Amino acid sequence: GRRNYDDQRKLGTVGKGLRIEGIKIRIVSKYKKHYIGIDVSHWQGDINYEKLVASQKIDFMITKVGWYSENNKRFIVDSKFEKNYKLAKQNKIPLGIYLYSYAKNVEDAKLEANELIKYLKSSGNSSFELPIFYDIEEDSQISYGKKAITDITIAFCETMKNAGYEVGVYSYSYWLNNYMEILRLPADYSLWGADYGTNNNGQIPSDLDKYSKTYDIWQFTDKAQIDG
């Protein structure tokens, strides 16, 4: 069956006022109903993993791996990815990654996937407990239309799946509901949607099951703070 996750973006690093993008995850209710995690990239700077682990508030992490640059004709690795990957592994934090998409068409999406696959294989940073997510939310992509955006998304994900990776799709809920044909996405894709609602105060909401039937991950805030 589908694994369910939720996400609370941008949890702050202690002493720096930076924001880590964080997550709540629900995998197997038999063991634990809700799992909290963080979503991080270069925007959060250097994370204090010792404090992060000691806080006992984080069950997993999803980190930005990078993006394909059309101008540079190469895959650009997020400047903090390799450090975050290494320290997540050292601290036994279950890990997933996401690629930010700038694809204009199916061919671009396949190129993004193949360049990511090449990087993962060449770097050896390719062991993940959680899916590889396709982050599709660029304003310039909206004009392509629902079908094209969905075709782009599926092209990336199927290329990654064929290389042996679990996959998922990330965007904000309005995008997923209005700019994509999400019912076309295969059932084995994890779906991660951001919706901060009207009470975006950084606290874990009481209605954590709000999107349990819609998304596998619900990203519910960009205001939360944790040690690390």
Residue ranges, per PLM feature:
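Residues within well-ordered beta-strands of beta-sheet-rich folds
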Residues: 24-26, 94, 168
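Lectin-type carbohydrate-recognition ectodomains
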Residues: 1-31
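Catalytic domains of cell-wall/extracellular-matrix polysaccharide-remodeling enzymes
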Residues: 125-207
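Flexible loop residues that form catalytic
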Residues: 28, 66, 196
